[in-house]
Amino acid sequence: MNPRRKKRLGLILALVLGASATVGLMLYALNQNMDLFYTPTELVNGKPDGTKPEVGQRLRIGGMVVVGSVKRDSQSLEVRFQVEDIGPKVTVIYDGILPDLFREGQGIVAQGVLVDATTVKAHEVLAKHDEEYMPPEVAEAMKKTH
């Protein structure tokens, strides 16, 4: 084989190998940052396609906070509450300050790790507001103009 061809072949193989490694690392990083969304019913019973999350899996869960289920630890910021949709209830454990819009009977989305079949240890809780929500500043301005 001609030395020039040998050099070209080595360069092409190195480029293909480098591109493959780059794509592989990108797919691995995307997989690590992917959080699948579940409702409480899907978390307990599985999704319609039969997939069910495993213990230790990162996920997001969304539903309504069960009225009377919020329990606060007096010694720390830990809060436990239950979330439901139309089926079973799932317990969410969160250590931190809850959003201002967090209320019983209100919709939330919690992002965290599945601890057991019906418990999620959340590191982020987002409170949903209803479609009629209006920031206080806007409501005040509308009162003045109308």
Curated annotation (Swiss-Prot):
Compartment(s) where it occurs, according to its Swiss-Prot or TrEMBL record: Cell inner membrane
Binding, heme: H129, Y133
GO molecular function, one term: metal ion binding
Sequence ranges on the Cytoplasmic membrane side: 1-8
GO terms under biological process: cytochrome complex assembly
Major location category of this protein: membrane
GO cellular component, one term: plasma membrane
InterPro entries attached to this UniProt entry: CcmE, CcmE-like_sf, NA-bd_OB-fold
Membrane topology qualifier: Single-pass type II membrane protein
UniProt keyword annotations, A-Z: Cell inner membrane, Cell membrane, Cytochrome c-type biogenesis, Heme, Iron, Membrane, Metal-binding, Signal-anchor, Transmembrane, Transmembrane helix
Periplasmic-facing ranges: 30-146
Parts of the chain that traverse the membrane: 9-29
Function field: Heme chaperone required for the biogenesis of c-type cytochromes. Transiently binds heme delivered by CcmC and transfers the heme to apo-cytochromes in a process facilitated by CcmF and CcmH.
Family: Belongs to the CcmE/CycJ family.
NCBIfam families: PRK13165.1, PRK13254.1-1, PRK13254.1-3
Protein name as catalogued: Cytochrome c-type biogenesis protein CcmE
Species of the source: Aliivibrio salmonicida (strain LFI1238)
Gene coding for it: ccmE
